[in-house]
Amino acid sequence: MRSAVATRRRFLAIGGVALAGAVLSRSIGAEIIKDVSAGFGAATPTLPSPGGAGINSAGVTTTTPTSTPTPTMPAPTPATVTIPVPVFQQSMVLDCETAALQQGLAYYGINVSQSQLFAGESADLRPPVMGPNHTVLRWGNPYTNFVGYVNGSDWTPTGFGVYWPVILRLARTYGLPNAIGGEGFAPSRIYSELAAGHPVQVWIETRFARVPLGAWTAWDGTQIRYSYAEHSVTLSGVSPTQVRVNDVLNASQYWVDKAFFETNFADFNNMAVIFQ
């Protein structure tokens, strides 16, 4: 297994400038990413005591009023939910999507190696057609195949990744027939699924970096939105303000603010696979 230094997207550079956030550590942005040891709790409201009730001689139900009016209770704050999804590290340079899938399957007791899962992604090894300013004009279709070399470089680029239809197909093939996937998921839907105990694989940028986005035309004509920091992780928990991330880049687990997550999530058109 490769070290964290050798794994995917540890350091990205455009024009010689390091992309801050692409290697975001737990000591940076403490208000954004919380360690998994941080706890969350919801206060339990105290309800007023009910008044006594009786029946008078006329057969009419009477109620003894309480000493204070009963207030209208606010909607309860959602509790923090964590899902015991195993944390794995990607075993190849660019197989983050495969490793995130492996985590989702393992939660349901389905143990499949990354190499076996990756074999089902039918990598398209044709090189890209590059344009000006280090942009990609033409390349493969990650909606149908893994694009490029899995142990290549996503900056050169000689390798890229794979998108939700391939991951969904593999999830169903290996024992989760009710898994669903797609794009355009509202963040509220993702949070509801997590609250229900369903791990969710999402597409973001590495360490939630903010980097330029582009689009290439696949060999079959499909328009592909891409980023040189494309990454995939498994969400394994939700609180009123944050989501918990199982990050296969270096087998870490941490919390990130919902607002920060939602910005990154939108970069790949709210792409997700829900494991259920």
Can you say where each PLM-predicted feature lies in the sequence?
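N-terminal Lys/Arg-rich, disordered targeting/topogenic segments
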Residues: 1-2
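Active-site-adjacent structural segments surrounding the nucleophilic cysteine of cysteine proteases
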Residues: 6-10, 15-164, 206, 213-219, ...
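A mature extracytoplasmic/lumenal domain signature
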Residues: 100, 182-184, 204-208, 237-239, ...
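Sec-exported extracytoplasmic/periplasmic mature domains
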Residues: 101, 105-110, 122-123, 172-176, ...
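Mid-length scaffold segments of soluble, non-membrane domains
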Residues: 162-163, 167-180
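Noncatalytic regulatory segments and standalone regulatory/sensor domains
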Residues: 171-172, 195, 214-227, 233-276
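Surface-exposed ligand/attachment interfaces on beta-rich extracellular proteins
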Residues: 186-190
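Loop/turn elements at helix/coil->beta-strand transitions in domains of secreted/extracellular proteins
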Residues: 196-200
